[in-house]
C-alpha cells in the first residue's frame, strides 16, 4: 500500500527482502529450513488484500509435507501458516475473497477467504505429465495442465494460467456465473 517492494529469494537464501519505493533496502526475513517460520523455497508471493490490514501471502513451494502458504505482516512478522498440502505452490493471485494458487504438479487450487479449497482446476491425473515441463504440444489437453507456474485474474473474474512448458502456454479460464 505504501509502495514498498518485496522480493523472494527462494533459490538461494530463502530470505524475503523489503525495499522502499525508491529501491532502498529496508529489511529481510526468513531463512532456509522446514520449521514453522522457515522457508524451503519461498517461491512466489502476493499482497493478500482479502484481509485488513493487507498482508503478504507467501508460497513455500518445497516445504514438507507437500508445500504450504504462509501469512506475514508487511513488516516481516510471522502471522500464520495458512494451508499445507498444496503440492508445490508456485505463486498466488487474489481477486475479491478468492486466491488462485498454481501447483507445479499440474493444477490450480482456488481458496476462499477462510482458505478453504473451493475448486481444483485443470488437474493432470497422469503422473508422467503433471509437473513435467517437456510435454510436446501435440499432447496438450485443453483445460489440463502440466506444470502451472503463474496465474492472474482479469476484471471480469476470468483466470489466466501460465503452464510451465518447454514451448510455453497460457490458458484463459472463463468464469462461469452460477
Where are the language model's segments positioned?
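Blade-level signature of beta-propeller repeat domains, shared across WD40, Kelch, NHL, RCC1
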Residues: 144-178
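Structural signal for glycine-centered tight turns and loop->strand junctions in beta-sheet-rich domains
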Residues: 3, 14, 23, 43, ...
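Short loop/turn segments immediately following the C-termini of beta-strands
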Residues: 10-11, 50, 61-63, 104-105, ...
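Surface-exposed loop and turn segments in beta-propeller and other repeat-based domains
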Residues: 24-40, 119-143
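Short loop/turn segments that connect beta-strands within beta-propeller blades
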Residues: 20-24, 73-77, 112-116, 174-177
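A short loop-to-beta-strand structural motif that recurs across blades of beta-propeller domains
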Residues: 14-18, 68-70, 107-109, 169-172
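Conserved beta-propeller blade signature
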Residues: 4-8, 55-58, 98-101, 109, ...
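Beta-rich, blade/repeat-based domains predominating
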Residues: 1-4, 34-55, 63-67, 85-98, ...
